[in-house]
Amino acid sequence: VHLGFATYDMKLPAGQRQTNSVHIYIAVDELLELCRKLTSGEMRHRLAQMRKSEEKAPLYKCLGGTSAEKLQRIGRARSDGKSLSRTAELHCGKNADFLFVANSGPGETNKTGLIVPRFGNNPENHVAVSMSWDCFSGFMLTTKAHYEAWLAAWYTRQAEKPVQKKQEAPARVETPAETKYDDMSMF
């Protein structure tokens, strides 16, 4: 699932207002798990626990990005030669229920292929969106509904594709041994 986070400065001229942009890719299974936690009450319970204990860890964290090699291959290499790290975090909010944060900046690809952020507390792009419980729930469940509709349409298209005609099996050819024993009963 592709989520686009952006900030805008309305004082700038039209067409130049976007000041930060971070594209986050969340695996479908992770999105569905977040939706399950929302609908089951697990996330509301966890949110209450975190508020009570003043825990600062994110409720959800997604690490991603594009390797330096791929950036080079597609003609978008960074000037520092590093990978592009993208992170998304869902935090317990102070002024609203949630704070959904997306960051991007330099990263390094580790041995397993994970792109590890190397921007510390200073990302090149930072977008934070405060969301109420209802707003976040609506956003997640609407995204889930759209994914399910897309999946149903995909299956429908697959079912409508013409079936390839099966090749006819070659005619059975009798061997001399078969004709010799055709008249004999087995028992």
Describe each PLM feature range.
Residues 56-126:
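Short, solvent-exposed interaction modules
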